[in-house]
């Protein structure tokens, strides 16, 4: 409310109160302006770590969208030092070798004394070569048979016999499993949109329309539907599921404008040594999505503070929600960014909070370096992290009573204290980390791809993308090469009939050696 002279009180104490209130409001507005300027013009990376050496993971705390922008902005800064010549890594032994001999002329193999020179060794220099993609046509020939003696009649059975066509991932199309796998990996693993792939094929003299390739992706994903049911079960088989979501624009959704925002969800779970990464397309950010995916699951679920996740514990008492220290830290970093230049180098409450978080991550670094087992990690945290957390909590309890609630510091403190019961649950299990980075890292390939293809042209395409991202990222997490896995999968899944057949095609049940042998024999 704007005050005029005739409405101002005469009491000096009331005037002082008005000035203080206005001053607080101005401070909040200035913070908001600086944060907006930082978002538009400033760098996206978080460089406010109190102790860089002790907090390696803290630089992973940005959301996936910000991390993608940060990767594009990185600059290499090399401090002064005595430069050592880097050693070149040897080329992989499994690559085929082609030998080219560079020998002297036979007339030069004579010594000055007249004797013939003997070969005493050789110098070998290996250089890397590449042959562009090899495209071939596979002709499927099915001989026809008929009796020339009686020529048969239809009532006695078929007059012409021919072998049935083999099951194919694209039954009536020209695409082989290898081609479908190549297109899928190029789009979903390498972020190469179909319109660019169309141009690449055109350079080889092959006319493949992008709409045709999009249809192949949908058909391939539909063929993998029974396999995805097993992927959902595998997701529930571990002690922890990390969840995150990111916007996706999908065109031609029934009853919705093309500008309406949809979402791609990601779930990271399954056995710790053979993780599952599951993508799920939805028109909504409602908590109904994680409730459906995690129905029947019992264990920890780590998320950010989005309110849609709160109903998980209510709908499923077996789920225990865990908070994310990444978001806590990000709120305090935002305060430093919002300071004016005069106050930027003056340590204050944000630096104190970041120091506490840095100490927590030093403990996590020790656990990684010692390669501790989950039970040993719990013991280490109980001994060293718990005292830090108690001290951090006591400091915040005291500080929040002295801080305006609407300012950035008040918001950061309130966020941390509200989430505190969930934040400290990582102490209970050695498989849990203090942050939700597993989900944010899992969703990053999709975010990179979205920057190139921008939107999905149809809900069927969005569902297909979710399926293929799930299979590719799960294969990568299990140590498999994405193309090799999809090539084998698309070759064998049309023949699968039982649950046992489908289960054998899960990334968790395959090894790199099996894939290499299959590709070599294909």
Regions found by a protein language model. Give the residues of each.
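Short, flexible loop/hinge motifs at secondary-structure junctions
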Residues: 1-174, 242-243, 249, 269, ...
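Catalytic center-proximal scaffold of phosphoryl-transfer enzymes
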Residues: 2, 108, 142-146, 151-522
